[in-house]
Structure formats: C-alpha cells, structure tokens
C-alpha cells in the first residue's frame, strides 16, 4: 500500500484501538467514525460538501441508514438535485449558511466538512453555533515553499486558507487546523492523507483504554 493509499491512523497510543476499525470510504475514515458512533450515539449528522454522495458513499451514510437525522449541504446544483433523489430521508441545503444550523442539537452530532477549499472557515462557523461531539475536517498538506504563509494584504489569514492558486483551492494544512480547533476544546485523535478527525475534550475518557 502506498502512502497515498494509507488508511487513517490514530495520533496517540491511547486511541490506537481505532486503527483496527479503519475501513471503508475514503481512507478508512468511515470505519473509524462508525466506531466512534458506537461510543457516543449521535442524534444528528451534518455533512458540508456532500456532493460525493451523489455517486460515492456519504462519509456518515451509515448513520443516515440507521435513521439518524442527517443534514447535507451541497453548493453544486446538479449534485444537490442528485442527492435529493438518492438521499430522500436527509434534509438537503445548497450553499452552507450557519443560520441553517439554528435549532439543531449540535452537541450530540457528528460533523464532516469536505468542500475542497474553505474547510476551516466553515468548520469554525459550525463551532460558533455549537460544539459537535466529533468533527472531521478536510486538510491539504502539500503546499511547498512557494505558497509561504498565504497571508495576502487585505485578507484576514483565516480566509486566506481557501484561496485559489493556479486554479487549486488552498486548504489549511493539518497542523494549522489542529492549532486553531484546540482553542474550541477539541483533540486530534486520527488523521489520514486528506482528513483530520477531532473529538470534543470532555468525551476523550470514553475512548481511552479500549
């Protein structure tokens, strides 16, 4: 198995039992999320950037199939319409708008952010509305020195993390996301080539020593 195909792995020994559950879409993330759901029993799932679910598995599709309330956001109209046809029990919205989260019990939720661009700023908007049990946020770690710190004049640094460079959306690197989300009370428990998985700190004892 090449590095680009390696499964999601736990970041610390105390979470190493999760490695045995790394299976399924995309690099084993779904299997680890399923293991976490067995511990935390979420009552809500939110996927922002759910267009992959048009033809590929939804990351949290296993919870939708179990009847857990699911809210999907997909900006692309064609993909959105396809989701409405194939995921009929989900609540489906277009562009992400944090106001759509009003009234939802985020404290009992799993949230996935996968928009190929402004992932961290969107994740932060979610965190300002509530504190999910689990958050998985897409990252991008292949900047290279030519991209530097990515802080152009006139733009707040956090929004720079989604700018286009040569037509490619620059996403926050994993270390940057981990540093920023720590302030909200989360710990990185596992990481794949493209996703970082975080758990709310008060729930960590549930995962230790398993």
Regions of interest found by a model, annotated:
Residues 1-14, 210:
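Non-catalytic N-terminal targeting/anchoring module and adjacent flexible stem/linker
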Residues 1, 8, 85, 100, ...:
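Detector for methionine-enriched segments
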Residues 17-113, 120, 141-143:
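SAM cofactor-binding core of SAM-dependent methyltransferases
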Residues 47, 108-111, 117-210:
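Conserved acidic-Pro-Pro-aromatic motif
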Residues 2-4, 25, 147, 154:
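Intrinsic low-complexity, intrinsically disordered segments enriched in polar/basic residues
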Residues 4-6, 16-20, 43, 106-109, ...:
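N-terminal start-of-chain detector that recognizes signal peptides
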Residues 7-9, 54, 88, 178:
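Alpha-helical protein-protein interaction elements
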């Amino acid at each position: 198995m090449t590095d680009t195909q390696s499964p999601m792995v736990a970041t610390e020994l105390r979470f190493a039992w999760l490695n045995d559950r790394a299976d399924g879409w995309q690099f084993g993330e779904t299997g680890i999320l399923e293991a976490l759901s067995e511990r935390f029993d979420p009552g809500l799932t939110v996927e922002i950037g759910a267009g992959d679910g048009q033809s590929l598995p939804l990351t949290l599709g296993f919870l939708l199939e179990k009847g857990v309330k699911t809210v999907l956001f997909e900006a692309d109209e064609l993909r959105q319409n396809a989701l409405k046809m194939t995921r009929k029990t989900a609540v489906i919205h277009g562009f992400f708008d944090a106001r759509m989260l009003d009234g939802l019990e985020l404290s009992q939720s799993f949230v996935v952010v996968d928009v190929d661009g402004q992932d961290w700023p969107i994740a932060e908007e979610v965190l300002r509305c509530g504190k999910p049990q689990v958050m998985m946020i897409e990252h991008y770690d292949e900047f290279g020195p030519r991209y530097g710190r990515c802080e152009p004049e006139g733009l707040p640094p956090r929004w720079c993390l989604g700018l286009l460079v040569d037509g490619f959306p620059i996403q926050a690197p994993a270390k940057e996301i981990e540093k920023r989300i720590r302030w909200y009370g989360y710990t990185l428990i596992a990481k794949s080539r493209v996703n970082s998985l975080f758990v709310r700190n008060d729930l960590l004892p549930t995962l230790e020593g398993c």
